[in-house]
Structures are given as C-alpha cells and as structure tokens.
C-alpha cells in the first residue's frame, strides 16, 4: 500500500505530508504532523531567521534518533514554486540550494524529513557578502550551562563596545547563538576575521570561562567557534527544532532572559505558546544593519601585536597567513608533521 498522506494548504500552496503519524521524537511521542504544526505556528519567527537565504537540507527520514544526511542540492522533483539559488562552495563545486521564502517552503522541507533549518548567512540577492555575523558558543564536555550564559553576556558587552547589537537565542542543544545583522559589504573571509577578533576579545575578558582554541585537546570551558562564519558553514536558525530527545528549540531570547534561561523549558510543545504570549524577541533584527569596521580595526591591532590568523576547518584549502594546520599533540613530531 502507498504511504499515507495528508494534504494541507500553506501560503496558497497544497503540500502532501507523507507519513504524518511517523514518530520523530520517541521520548515525547512527537510525530511528523506535530513538527509540521509547530512550524506553522512559529513560521513568521522562523522566516526571520531563514527568509531569502539558501539553506542546506539536513534530513532525518526515520526521526531524530536515527541516521541523517545532508543534502545541499535541492531535489530535482520539486514544486514549481520552490525557489533556489546557485551557491559556490570552497571545493569549487556549485549547487542549486533551497531558498525559503515563505511558510510553504519551510513545510515542504519538513516533509522531506528536515527537523531544523540551516541557512547560510547571505541573502539570495548577494551570495558572496554575508549580512549576518554569527557567534556560536559551544561548551565542552562537562561545562555547566551557566558558563555559557556568562560568556554570552561578555559577548554582548564586547559587541556593544564596538557599536554592534546582537540577538541571542538558545542553540537548542547545549549552547547559545548570538546573531548580528551587518551590512553586506564584506566577504566571508573578512566576516570570519571580524568574528575571530571579537572572540579573542571575549577570551581576554573572561579567560577562565572561554577559549578560541581550535584544537579540542587545547580547549577548556566554552568554545567561541569563529569558523562558523566561514563560507559553507551553517547553524540552526531561529525557532528550529533540534534533533534531541525532548525536541528542544533554538529559541530567541531577550537579553534580560539570558542569565536564567533553561534550554529544556524551550521545546516543540512550549515555544508556540511563548511566542503567542510574549512576541518574538528576535523580531527587530532587521531594523538596523551594523558595520564591521571597529571589529576589523581590532583585528588589525591583534595582527600588529603578533596575533595572526587561526586554523580553518579541515575541508578548506590552506589560507594565506593561516598557521600550520597541525594539532598540538602531532606538532611535537616536528616540521614534517602532516597538516589536517
């Protein structure tokens, strides 16, 4: 027998939801239908984070606890109203990626087995100049979430001291994300450079809390992942449900909530009511776009003081000015140690 389907209308488009009763979160019993209904309820907030951006499809065909795969190229068999953008990757390859322009595009992706939304930090009108700087606070094993909260507040202060305003949200996992709307004037490399300078300043102010060390064996506390600003890196966007057992959400926050927020309170079954009652703390992110000039000046001062670039992700070609891409434990082998 063919798989059961449920046809719904979203933004004047009919979408057939396949296997709507399939359980996606076994711990809570949440189904694909529950996931669809969630995204319909938060669609305006979700679109604030992904509208007009190319995005990677991260597909969980059998639910959050099962195997997933990334799909950068949008499926050939798709409705005519699905928008795409041709994106170039560091490898030199290119692909037509999904651009989510309305709630129907989100629901279409959810029907493919996506759980969270993973957009690039660019708009489809300018694919080479990000309009978003992303701060990803990633706690190491055993690091208390309170250290993430405290680090986020230092990030807020550093951004403010350099003329920028950030919008915080829980990551939906163990961290916090802070997004900054910026003018689309700088390349991915320049935005990453600004993010690295900002992260190093946060580390200087709170060295016991956080680190910018790329190699895990050197890290402590909360890692400020500056490389999330490199081309082809994505983070889950606002109101994304995350593939964790209790279906936590990457939920936008007011800054006065950060010090006491509990990520486990922000779930698929609680966030729609919160959004309806409180409104969207991230709604103002597009009200002003900021300049990176102050952070880039900070980077120049770091470089003049001998603090150059930091390692890039392993799938990137060696970058000009990048230190040797060798983990410290291997560097002891000397100059012949293989780079990663």
Language model regions located:
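Flexible loop/turn segments at secondary-structure boundaries
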Residues: 24, 64-67, 77, 143, ...
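Secondary-structure capping and boundary motifs in well-ordered enzyme cores
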Residues: 31, 126-129, 144-147, 151, ...
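Long, well-ordered alpha-helical scaffolding segments within enzyme catalytic domains
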Residues: 38, 145-164, 191-206
């Amino acid at each position: 027998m063919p798989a059961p389907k449920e046809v719904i209308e979203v933004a004047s488009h009919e979408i057939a939801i396949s296997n709507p009763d399939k359980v996606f979160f076994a711990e809570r019993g949440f189904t694909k239908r529950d996931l669809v209904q969630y995204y319909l309820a938060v669609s305006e907030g979700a679109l604030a984070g992904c509208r007009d951006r190319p995005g990677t499809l991260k597909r969980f065909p059998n639910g959050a606890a099962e195997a997933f795969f990334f799909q950068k190229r949008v499926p050939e068999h798709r409705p005519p109203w699905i928008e795409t953008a041709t994106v170039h990757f560091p490898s030199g390859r290119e692909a037509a990626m999904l651009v989510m322009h309305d709630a129907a595009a989100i629901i279409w992706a959810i029907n493919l087995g996506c759980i969270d939304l993973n957009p690039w930090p660019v708009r489809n009108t300018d694919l080479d100049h990000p309009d978003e700087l992303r701060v990803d606070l990633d706690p190491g094993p055993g690091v208390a979430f309170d250290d993430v909260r405290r680090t986020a507040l230092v990030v807020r202060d550093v951004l403010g001291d350099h003329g920028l305003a950030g919008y915080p949200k829980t990551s939906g996992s163990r961290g916090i994300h802070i997004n900054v709307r910026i003018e689309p004037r700088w390349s991915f490399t320049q935005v990453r450079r600004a993010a690295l300078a900002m992260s190093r300043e946060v580390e200087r102010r709170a060295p016991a809390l956080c680190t910018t060390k790329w190699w895990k064996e050197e890290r402590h506390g909360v890692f400020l992942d500056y490389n999330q600003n490199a081309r082809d890196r994505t983070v889950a966007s606002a109101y994304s449900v995350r593939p964790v057992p209790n279906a936590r959400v990457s939920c936008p926050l007011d800054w006065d909530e950060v010090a006491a927020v509990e990520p486990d309170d922000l779930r698929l079954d609680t966030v729609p009511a919160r959004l309806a009652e409180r409104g969207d703390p991230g709604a103002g992110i597009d009200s002003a776009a900021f300049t990176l000039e102050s952070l880039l000046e900070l980077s120049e001062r770091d470089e003049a003081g001998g603090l150059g670039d930091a390692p890039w992700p392993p799938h990137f070609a060696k970058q000009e000015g990048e230190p040797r891409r060798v983990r410290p434990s291997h560097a002891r082998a000397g100059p012949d140690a293989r780079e990663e």
